[in-house]
Amino acid sequence: MESFQQIKNNKVDLISTNDPLDKNRLLIEDLWESVLREECPDDQAERLIQLKELSYSKQIEGDSSKTFKKEIVDIVNSMDLAESIAAARAFSLYFQLVNILEQRVEEDRYIQSFTNKNVQKSPDNLDPFAPALARQNAPVTFRELFYRLRKLNVPPGKLEELLQEMDIRLVFTAHPTEIVRHTIRHKQTRVANLLKKIQVEQFLTKEEKNFLKIQLKEEVRLWWRTDELHQFKPSVLDEVDYALHYFQQVLFNAMPQLRGRIAEALTENYPDVQLPSQSFCNFGSWVGSDRDGNPSVTPEITWRTACYQRQLMLERYITATSHLRDQLSVSMQWSQVSSSLLESLETDRVKFPAIYEARATRYRSEPYRLKLSYILEKLRLTQERNNLLADNGWKFDLEGELNTKNIDKVENLYYKSVNEFTYDLELIKNSLISTDLTCEAVNTLLTQVHIFGFSLASLDIRQESTRHSDAIQELTKYLDLSVQYDQMSEDEKIKWLVDELNTKRPLIPSDVKWTNTTEETFSVFKMVKRLQQEFGSRICHAYVISMSHSASDLLEVLLLAKEMGLLDQNSKNSNLLVVPLFETVEDLKRAPEVMEKLFKLDFYKSLLPKVGESFKPLQELMLGYSDSNKDSGFVSSNWEIHRAQIALQNLASRNNILLRLFHGRGGSVGRGGGPAYQAILAQPSGTLKGRIKITEQGEVLASKYSLPELALYNLETVTTAVIQNSLVNNRLDATPEWNQLMSRLAETSRSHYRKLVYENPDLLNFFQEVTPIEEISKLQISSRPARRKKGAKDLSSLRAIPWVFGWTQSRFLLPSWFGVGTALSSELNSDPQQIELLRVLHQRWPFFRMLISKVEMTLSKVDLEVAKYYVDTLGSEENKDSFDDIFEVISKEYSLTKSLVLEITGKNKLLESDRDLKSSVSLRNKTIIPLGFLQVSLLRRLRDQTRQPPISEFLIDKDESRRAYSRSELLRGALLTINGIAAGMRNTG
């Protein structure tokens, strides 16, 4: 069995086999075609295969683009509904297989870069980072990084100081457009693992390889017969389960390896530098705790999420401890043990007589096994307690319940904190060391405990600012203040809030029935208090205020925290870190002014947590990429975030405050996404200082964390970029001429973007008619609504994620580039010589290079011929003229932007300098075309029926009298095309 099915293969001429990626694509092509031939009727399978080859080969042969696309349109329009659904599923499967393959190739390249001891060197008189920069999207490894830092004469002491202070936090989020079912993700992982085995062909016999191919084909056929669409709207706890999958399957084991790799690289280049014992990379989560615009996230849900996370960690620790007990068979007949360990065994014997009776005979001369038996029992008791808490909710008084029922308390038997578990493991480790023994499994488990604790990830609470001000307004109305809260000026609000924060008497009466919304707001703070009592402050410490506009927004949250016991006035200690999220461009501009007001309040500064050896106060601030981009366009959003970081860091330094910037990046370029290495290096010099917090959106989790080496690649990429940015100061961000140029570009691009998006009265109708935005809202893919306000249909209520999603599906990708060309053109029209300055910026300034790189990548994915088909076919007749005008504006801006980007980069074609990315995008751009036309065909038929409600649910299509079909079937077909295009574009929103 040389291939999945012996067929004539004419794709060899289409794909170069010199590259590993191209070579393996042939395997995927063969697999895909073989599955279609077995799962579809013969004529249908051949038609689908020909359709894909037509979309690919015709462009390569140089046929007129419009002519060959018309051929595809004719084929698509001739399909009945069953064929259309089969086509949507087939192309979706194809792209998902290609995605798996590309991830596997990325994984292999990372393994090669890690195992390659020969660091790519640059001449002594050049920038040691030049080879890395030349590769653009190829990050350096730990080994490369430390070698280059040594060449730059970075002192060991400076590096060690940074490592001591380094604090990287990656925050997983649920995603309103996470398109792939959890069930399908599992199948993708199995396919990836089988591909990995097949690709080591030099170690396989012909029979072994053929057997693996049979297994691979079986898995994909099972996948084909699995429903791709969610059958019900996922609950928040479903989303929690989805996010926890990556911790359970990948990250739990990957994190100790990451630490091992950085330690090995330090030993080679900086042998005197000690890696600190604490974790430099930690995880957070919004899944189950982000309640902004999601009424499904209740206090009860957040409580159960915390219990689920602890349950997962306890399960992993029980498994690891059981393996340790099998391994640590050291006998006292042949080895000493520490006196501390022996003393602990005696203490445990008294506490756990049943365990002693059951295990003492078997392990009487094996002290480590006996100790680990006691540890296992403590973990199981902790697990039992956790299950009780999860089942009964956050208001459940466990201790009171036990007392009432006269049940003996399990006092001192379960682990009350992770520190007790750590102490037991340290006893074992130190006893081994005292007798000249080591056990890597013990060290690995200790590393995992240091990183994950019992909490797994910190849960950030997020809520929109008006929820707090509305609650306080209701409170002040009840208290009958002389001036109601909503009538106060900002200065009056600050004074009243600070006075109340300094008052020890309670403000909120306990016996009042509040409105449901206010009661919910108060309950969140009560639940957080209970969470911290049970789990410790690590489980839930940060409270993010979305749409922060003013200093009072933060003080309101502190006041509510004080009322619920989260703030100790005597010790000036707050158990809640209040984090403002500045989202719009105007709010980003005002952010330094807002924070300066707060830093001038001694009371506020005293509440900030003190961190590090310096024991300085720490302020965390979040910067929103999504809404600022939707509000003002790509250039303006990125520039204002860049400027805000510099201004905020300068402000913090003047006030002797440490700053941790939290970047709310999305998966797509229109929401701050893109290569992490480039993005972090592009942060203003001096703003990181080893500290960064970044959202990891639900839609990109699979591409970053589905495979072990992929996860390590991403984690090493982020860590090396943070170290490089913090230690290698390029000082280019302070160049006045460059800053002035960027400010002009930002203002011009913002003006042009807003003229189209917010000032053109027809744009909203255009977006709703020519993109599948309304159908996207019918996908059962998220617990969160697509709009902030129920029933609202204006742009302001639409979330940034579906905004980007709709433009991506229709191949405009408008939020990621519109306005750039006009801004650049305006600059060059005033002074043509500025092109040289722009080229210098692209070559030397990481921020500008990142900006142009993202625009270039996005432009390469745009297909205006396909987009025009959406406009012509889906646009209503009454809007034809205005829609044509809008498309003309978009088309001109695209051409202008593309030509000027190429002029700046000095290339003839987009992505010319990144062969791998260009190859991937080219394959997708060509093969995805039928899906776009298919989506338009299905949307047109679906909307025609919606506009003219039929007497019966079942109809005969006016274009195809072959069979009856239902409106729900049409919707299903349309949703399947959304799945396929999302897979082909490799992102949604």
From Swiss-Prot:
Residues making up the signal peptide according to the UniProt record: none
Q: Drop me one GO molecular function for this one.
A: magnesium ion binding
Q: Does the keyword Lyase apply?
A: yes
Write out the transmembrane intervals: none
- Cysteine pairs forming cystine bridges in this chain are none
Q: Which GO terms describe its cellular component?
A: cytosol
Q: If you read the UniProt record, what top EC class would you report for this enzyme, in one word?
A: lyase
Supply the InterPro entries for this chain. PEP_COase, PEP_COase_bac/pln-type, PEP_COase_Lys_AS, PEPCASE_His_AS, Pyrv/PenolPyrv_kinase-like_dom
| Classification via PROSITE patterns | PEPCASE_1, PEPCASE_2
- Taken from the record, one Pfam family name reads PEPcase
HAMAP family, per the entry: PEPcase_type1
Protein name as catalogued? Phosphoenolpyruvate carboxylase
Annotated organism of origin: Prochlorococcus marinus (strain MIT 9312)
UniProt lists the gene as: ppc
